[in-house]
Amino acid sequence: MLEQMGKAAKAASYQLAVLNTAQKDRALLTIADLLEVESATILAANVLDLADARQNGMSEALLDRLLLTQERLSAIASDVRQVCRLTDPVGQVIDGSMLDNGLKLERRRVPLGVVGVIYEARPNVTIDVASLCLKTGNAVILRGGKETYRTNAATVKVIQQALSQCDLPAAAVQAIESPDRELVNQLLKLDRYIDMLIPRGGAGLHKLCREQSTIPVITGGIGVCHIYADDSIDFDKALTVIESAKVQRPSACNSLETLLVNRSIADRFLPELSKKMAASGVTLHASSLAMPYLTSGPANVVAVEDANYNDEWLSNDLNVTLVDDLDAAVAHIREHGTQHSDAILTRSLSNAERFVREVDSSAVYVNASTRFTDGGQFGLGAEVAVSTQKLHARGPMGLEALTTYKWIGYGDDLIRA
């Protein structure tokens, strides 16, 4: 089955690669319209997925991720229309020159070809990824979580219907509808057809893909994000940033997981932190250094375990520890971070510049929340993932990250001397 899907996707990718922007945008607008027209079918499939998930004991937080409503589906359709407004990177000339040997050489953006995406219980990802791949002339094979396989199947059917209406190959967007996990292992070996694989899930999925895939893999999305509050901060402003980074959306990969506080301000700052976190319902996992300053405060406090510093909580939990200086903060981030998003709160320009130079994460912030690591917030539009590696993309992956380039040389019956 997957062999046939791969062949069909590769054939479709050749057709997509030569489409102009107007043709791709027409397909996207048709998809957006049909999502609204066929919303009842998609929502009915989602109801069945929700019922199974609830019966299997899925938490309310995860059920909410899985849930589609008419309002949410309309918002997803609106997001597809927004992709139409983004600049198409395909065909852009990155650079070019006339060489001494007479060759006019340029580097031009082109689609990757076929993208494979493995993701979990978020039905909106199906549309987000499909729309970005189509905009960049890529075919895509989707493998959503077993919790959403009915919703994904119904959604992809609508997308394929829209593609057919636009005289484009339905195989440009395909989904593996079976929840059989063995098919994931088979997908990882389709290097003959798939040019890039993107896993969007937990550490286990990323490890599986890195170890088993014969396809180039873009990993990321696992965010053990830090904020370092140095000794020059404005307490009120810093507390506002810390609170927002933790509680705005705790389940997001760019939410704050560990707070590092300069030891010299601990006796004054941590009691204020306790009040702020108590009001937001955050449990503090305090080190032995931080604990004495937090035990008398209103926040729920427990002793941190060493392993917690590597935890992506994705909940109203926050590690808190003290460091002597910037060197110690950077060392902690290097040991426990995932190169996702890390920030410093400071009024010291030299500390800010050092932090930016020395913290090797895909996004580094000065006096700003880690929550900004997002395609929409970066002005990239939607994103297919957040990459924490260095090749071939890093940070939020928008349209450009779904392209590569080719060298094109022009001559006048030119031969090499």
From Swiss-Prot:
Where in the cell does this protein reside?
Answer: Cytoplasm
What InterPro entries is this protein classified in?
Answer: Ald_DH/histidinol_DH, Ald_DH_C, Ald_DH_N, Aldehyde_DH_dom, G-glutamylP_reductase_CS, Glu-5-SA_DH, GPR_dom
**Principal place of residence:** cytoplasm
Query: What superkingdom does the record give?
Result: Bacteria
The reaction(s) annotated as catalysed by this protein in its Swiss-Prot or TrEMBL entry are: L-glutamate 5-semialdehyde + phosphate + NADP(+) = L-glutamyl 5-phosphate + NADPH + H(+)
Pathway assigned in UniProt: Amino-acid biosynthesis; L-proline biosynthesis; L-glutamate 5-semialdehyde from L-glutamate: step 2/2
- Name of the top EC class for this enzyme: oxidoreductase
GO cellular component: a single term: cytoplasm
Instruction: Fetch the PROSITE patterns from UniProt.
Output: PROA (PS01223)
Q: Which GO terms describe its biological process?
A: L-proline biosynthetic process
- Family listed: Belongs to the gamma-glutamyl phosphate reductase family.
Tell me what this protein is called: Gamma-glutamyl phosphate reductase
